Amino acid sequence: MSSVESFVDSAVADNDVVVFAKSYCPYCHATEKVIADKKIKAQVYQIDLMNNGDEIQSYLLKKTGQRTVPNIFIHQKHVGGNSDFQALFKKGELDSLFNTA
């Protein structure tokens, strides 16, 4: 297992909520806003500011089938990107996911 794979897998395993994002991405900002508004403790990684960000993004594609950001995990479960996350929010399903966090 590469160091990037170990980093991503550890981040997902060690945190209830993990978001792999990019600092300039409006969809990432929308996800981060909901998390902040709900006062959820989340680990957010701005991969465009990390030296190995491209490698992380490539591994996320391999792991999840999704290359785009944000790439969101709740309780080690991949929930998708911002559109998936916002759909869960609109349906009122985020609270139950977060409450198990």
UniProtKB/Swiss-Prot annotation:
Gene Ontology CC terms: cytoplasm; cytosol; nucleus
GO BP terms in the entry: cellular response to oxidative stress
Cited Gene3D superfamilies: Glutaredoxin
Recorded GO MF terms: glutathione disulfide oxidoreductase activity; glutathione peroxidase activity
Keyword vocabulary terms for this entry: Disulfide bond, Electron transport, Redox-active center, Transport
Keyword flag Transport: yes
Every Glutaredoxin domain range: 5-101
Disulfide bonds: C25-C28
UniProt-listed CDD domains: GRX_GRXh_1_2_like (cd03419)
InterPro entries according to UniProt: GLR_AS, Glutaredoxin, Glutaredoxin_euk/vir, Glutaredoxin_subgr, Thioredoxin-like_sf
Family from the record: Belongs to the glutaredoxin family.
Job of this protein: The disulfide bond functions as an electron carrier in the glutathione-dependent synthesis of deoxyribonucleotides by the enzyme ribonucleotide reductase. In addition, it is also involved in reducing some disulfides in a coupled system with glutathione reductase. Thioltransferase catalyzes cellular thiol-disulfide transhydrogenation reactions. It transfers reducing equivalents to cytosolic protein and nonprotein disulfides.
Name under which the protein is recorded: Glutaredoxin-1
Protein's organism: Schizosaccharomyces pombe (strain 972 / ATCC 24843) (Fission yeast)
